[in-house]
Amino acid sequence: MRFKNRFQRFMNHRAPANGRYKPTCYEHAANCYTHAFLIVPAIVGSALLHRLSDDCWEKITAWIYGMGLCALFIVSTVFHIVSWKKSHLRTVEHCFHMCDRMVIYFFIAASYAPWLNLRELGPLASHMRWFIWLMAAGGTIYVFLYHEKYKVVELFFYLTMGFSPALVVTSMNNTDGLQELACGGLIYCLGVVFFKSDGIIPFAHAIWHLFVATAAAVHYYAIWKYLYRSPTDFMRHL
């Protein structure tokens, strides 16, 4: 109780079961900045992977991954700005909140795309290349139908989609980069604690954003190091 009283201006009460948490102005600002600052690095990083690509398939994969990465930070930033400054536009805010939730599904699919597209897979495992996008489409439909109604179910979908392709990736003959992939996944899972702690921990959602940024950086490093060329090769091609 003493902790809550001390930080009351930085945190509001928890949201009802079927409602959305209302951040304080401080939390709104933190939510915006923690992802806004990552938009440019995401764009630059995506362009770097495209530049390092050897063939058309690697370029396509770089664009898929890059678009998912950039979309995550852009949509999140726009939603939090609208939620902070234009909250009176209920319909607009609701639409962007849905987009913010839907883009997570496609970001998960895009994050696995380099591993599924550029590594040799067995006949059964290769089906995950398209099945993960089917899961993303299913998650999008779920958001349209049940947005904010069953939060635990939504969280279960995110975690299931995040872990399912990992089972396939770990079965590949070439295991380079899997430690970084697992490390990033663990960081995402730890961040979920803060994702579900609005109204309990001040700036919980902004802290969740930092976990997302850290995990995404670890995964990007693994993709850059093990699936694309080294900086030395890149400089040679300039």
From Swiss-Prot:
Belongs to the ADIPOR family. It comes from the Eukaryota. GO terms for cellular component: Golgi apparatus; late endosome membrane; lysosomal membrane; membrane; plasma membrane. Pfam families: HlyIII. This is Monocyte to macrophage differentiation factor. GO terms for biological process: positive regulation of neuron differentiation; positive regulation of protein kinase activity; regulation of protein localization. It is a multi-pass membrane protein. The chain crosses the membrane at residues 29-49, 62-82, 102-122, 125-145, 152-172, 175-195, 199-219. Involved in the dynamics of lysosomal membranes associated with microglial activation following brain lesion. Keywords: Endosome, Lysosome, Membrane, Receptor, Transmembrane, Transmembrane helix. Exhibits relatively ubiquitous expression with preferential expression in mature (in vitro differentiated) macrophages. NCBIfam families: hlyIII (TIGR01065). Residues 50-61, 123-124, 173-174, 220-238 are lumenal. Residues 1-28, 83-101, 146-151, 196-198 are cytoplasmic. Its main location: membrane. One of its GO terms (molecular function) is signaling receptor activity. InterPro entries: AdipoR/HlyIII-related, Hy-lIII. PANTHER family: ADIPOR/PROGESTIN RECEPTOR-RELATED (PTHR20855), MONOCYTE TO MACROPHAGE DIFFERENTIATION FACTOR (PTHR20855:SF26). The keyword Membrane applies. It is found in: Late endosome membrane; Lysosome membrane.
